[in-house]
A protein has these predicted regions:
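Catalytic domains of riboflavin
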Residues: 1-236
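Single conserved hydrophobic/aromatic residue that forms the stacking wall/gate
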Residues: 235-243
Length: 243
């Protein structure tokens, strides 16, 4: 399959548009509609529901989930790819049944608003938050993390709206059928693999956290701490002085 460039997808997201993101063949091997939560409209939600036909979800960071008391849907996550669903929600104000395109758009806007309190969300509801990993696709090569990375790269807050793409036969669209869908709706299509390469090329993966003095019986040393955002641990180094 021939994919569009990550740069072109970021430009589309920045304009408030939608793109298709494909994960690896050895994973779910599915394409999802993805856009920035900050830019979502009722028309976007209607398109996802009508043309995408999958579950409409919103990716959120761990701090956002904690602030809004978005508890895990299941404490013991045994799903195949450990997708971190929280309990589903609806916005308390400005919605009716919660399922309409306008209601779901309102709920998404409520989730990403800095003014929102836990009490502003009813549980359960019709929007499904998913908590993304710190480090994005460098830590987990999933659609959740890809949507967060793309939104951030486009200058929005770190949250995306995602929806799987299902065909007329009720099965996931893949391969040539997914490309036809992208062409029909004039959508960019990218791979998570390319997004990983893009981030590794453009960003500093290892970041210095702190430098402290470490006194020992052999003398004082400088202990340097580094965070590798692609893994879940910290590196420690003890630089030596050249002879």
């Amino acid at each position: 399959m021939k994919f569009d460039s990550i740069s072109s997808a970021i430009k589309e997201i920045k304009k408030g548009g939608m793109v298709i993101v494909l994960d690896n063949e050895d994973r779910e091997n599915e394409g999802d509609l993805v856009m920035a939560s900050d830019a979502v409209s009722s028309a976007n939600i209607n398109f996802m529901a009508k043309e995408g036909r999958g579950l409409i979800c919103i990716s959120v960071s761990k701090p956002r989930a904690k602030k809004l008391d978005l508890e895990p849907m299941e404490q013991r996550n045994t799903s195949l790819h450990e997708t971190a669903f929280t309990v589903s929600v609806d916005a308390v104000k400005g919605t009716t049944t919660g399922i309409s395109a306008s209601d779901r758009c309102k709920t998404i806007k409520t989730i990403v608003s800095d003014r929102t309190k836990p009490s502003d969300l009813a549980r359960p509801g019709h929007i499904f938050p998913i908590v993304g990993r710190n480090g994005g696709v460098l830590r987990r090569a999933g659609h959740t993390e890809a949507s967060m990375d793309l939104a951030q790269l486009a200058g929005f807050s770190r949250s995306g709206v995602i929806c799987e793409i299902i065909g007329d036969d009720g099965e996931m669209l893949r391969g040539p059928d997914l490309m036809k869908f992208a062409k029909k709706h004039n959508l960019k299509i990218i791979s998570i693999e390319d997004l990983i390469r893009f981030r590794r090329k453009k960003e500093s993966i290892v970041q210095k956290l702190e430098e402290i003095k470490l006194p020992t019986k052999f003398g004082d040393f400088d202990l340097h701490m580094y965070d590798d955002i692609s893994v879940s641990y910290t590196h420690l180094t003890l630089p030596t002085t050249p002879y």
